[in-house]
Amino acid sequence: MALYRPLLLHHPTSPSVTTFLRNYPSKPIKFSSLPFLHRCRKSRVSSSSARCCSSMESPPEGYRRNVGVCLMNSSKKIFTASRLDIPSAWQMPQGGIDEGEDPRVAVMRELKEETGVHSAEILAEAPHWITYDFPPDVREKLKVRWGSDWKGQAQKWFLLKFTGKDEEINLLGDGTEKPEFGEWSWTSPDQVVENAVEFKKPVYKEVMSAFASHLQ
């Protein structure tokens, strides 16, 4: 059970201890079982922001097709996690859609790959694709990683209800991909936006608006 007072750590080789997270200002956090070495890596992100996100009926040319996962628990808190490469940046799970893959299949696959979670059901789907541009430095970095020069991402967002227990969450994922996250927490919609990297804030505001009736 996630605690919102002292910070509860979970580590496979040591007993639970109580502490506070430096990268998550004034917010308690629940750690996964990710080894300690993964929680110490640091990097910086540019403060430059992309243009504001926009909503479209279909993905535009030049944008990578992607699904976003807004995972909500029984207390209507939303799952967010800190990136290993940018520990100060917290985000909801997301990932690319494979060629010919249904977005509803992709969203469940990405959730399991990144968090180990399989106990979830789709409650709602955002009516439009939400697009955003990469800042120039991020675009260059991703061009090397992906081998394609995408302008940004076109995302289809889904609201999922978490039906399992917190112990199911494992940031090592299902073992099919390299871990992306270091810590995780259940947070309010406002905190989701507040703690996101700058160029994703407009996207997250639109996602919270799209699912507002379910999050109240």
From Swiss-Prot:
Record-linked PROSITE patterns: NUDIX (PS51462), NUDIX_BOX (PS00893)
Q: Which InterPro entries match?
A: Nudix_hydrolase, NUDIX_hydrolase-like_dom_sf, NUDIX_hydrolase_CS, NUDIX_hydrolase_dom, RppH
- Binding residues for Mn(2+): 110, 114
Q: Does the keyword Oxidoreductase apply?
A: no
HAMAP family per the UniProt record, alphabetical: Nudix_RppH (MF_00298)
Q: Which cofactor does it need?
A: Mg(2+); Mn(2+)
> What residues does the Nudix hydrolase domain cover?
62-209
Free-text tissue specificity from the UniProt record: Expressed in roots, leaves, stems and inflorescences.
UniProt GO BP = nucleoside phosphate metabolic process
Span of the annotated motif Nudix box: 95-116
| Description of the deletion phenotype | No visible phenotype under normal growth conditions.
Spell out the GO cellular component terms annotated for this protein, sorted alphabetically and separated by semicolons. Answer: chloroplast
According to its UniProt record, which protein family does this protein belong to?
Belongs to the Nudix hydrolase family.
- Give the residue range annotated as the organelle targeting sequence: 1-53
Per the entry, what this protein does is: Mediates the hydrolysis of some nucleoside diphosphate derivatives. Can use diadenosine 5',5'''-P(1)P(5) pentaphosphate (Ap(5)A), diadenosine 5',5'''-P(1)P(4) tetraphosphate (Ap(4)A) and diadenosine 5',5'''-P(1)P(3) triphosphate (Ap(3)A) as substrates.
Species name: Arabidopsis thaliana
Q: Where in the cell is it found?
A: Plastid, Chloroplast
- EC nos: 3.6.1.-
How far does the signal peptide extend, from start to end residue? none
Keyword annotations from UniProtKB, A to Z: Chloroplast, Hydrolase, Magnesium, Manganese, Metal-binding, Plastid, Transit peptide
Task: Give the transmembrane region(s).
Answer: none
Q: Name one GO molecular function term.
A: bis(5'-adenosyl)-pentaphosphatase activity
The record's section on Gene3D superfamilies has: Nucleoside Triphosphate Pyrophosphohydrolase
Q: What is this protein called?
A: Nudix hydrolase 26, chloroplastic
